[in-house]
């Protein structure tokens, strides 16, 4: 079984072979990899930096293979990711340019079929920037703009039952 780690000193994602040997698999501003609940897969975004279009990568920790799970779609890029279960991830996808769209909307992606299902449908007034699972609920937060020129904002939070995601 392979492992994966983030080296904060070099800011790289490294694949760890069963022998202990390491190989850098991402060096362009990657996120810290997150493992699936059963620890057989990992996901990370690279690069994730201002106005740079990154990919969401899936790493199979059983064989060490890596693939792009979500690539930029026009100007829309993956910005944050968590695991829903062993077969699905939840990813924030949003506009990649400018200063207004700091977040985006939540999508569920099946890791086997790469089928993408939109969970939230906010316009640019609401920008989701973070998400987490707790007590069978999907919690998410970000900002809601309060003026017409999208300059002033307040904190925004909401929650969705994981059971309701089955209907999407």
Range-by-range predicted roles:
Residues 1-59, 153:
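Terminal domain-start segments
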Residues 2, 78-79, 84, 133, ...:
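Eukaryotic scaffold repeat domains enriched in small/polar residues
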Residues 3, 44-45, 90-92, 139-142:
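Residue position within the beta-strands of beta-propeller blades
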Residues 14-30, 62-78, 112-126, 162-168:
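Multi-bladed beta-propeller domains
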Residues 33-42, 80-88, 130-136:
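Blade-terminus and WD-like Trp-Asp/Gly-His loop motifs, strongest in beta-propeller folds
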Residues 47-51, 95-100, 144-149:
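Short glycine/acidic-enriched loop and turn motifs that connect beta-strands
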Residues 61, 67-69, 79-81, 86-111:
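A generic tandem-repeat structural signature
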Residues 101-168:
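Acidic, small-residue rich beta-repeat scaffolds with periodic aromatic anchors
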């Amino acid at each position: 079984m392979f492992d994966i780690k983030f080296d904060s000193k070099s800011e790289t994602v490294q694949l760890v072979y069963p022998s202990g040997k390491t190989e850098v698999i991402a060096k362009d501003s990657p996120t810290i990899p997150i493992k699936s609940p059963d620890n057989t897969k990992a996901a990370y975004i690279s690069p994730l930096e201002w106005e740079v279009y990154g990919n969401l990568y899936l790493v199979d920790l059983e064989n060490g293979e890596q693939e792009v799970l979500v690539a930029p779609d026009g100007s829309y890029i993956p910005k944050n990711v968590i695991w829903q279960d062993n077969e699905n991830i939840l990813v924030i996808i949003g506009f990649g340019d400018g200063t207004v769209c700091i977040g985006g909307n939540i999508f569920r992606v099946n890791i086997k079929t790469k089928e993408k299902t939109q969970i939230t449908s906010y316009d640019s007034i609401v920008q989701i920037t973070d998400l987490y699972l707790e007590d069978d609920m999907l919690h998410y937060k970000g900002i809601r703009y309060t003026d017409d020129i999208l300059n002033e904002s307040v904190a925004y939070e909401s929650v969705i039952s994981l059971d309701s995601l089955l209907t999407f």
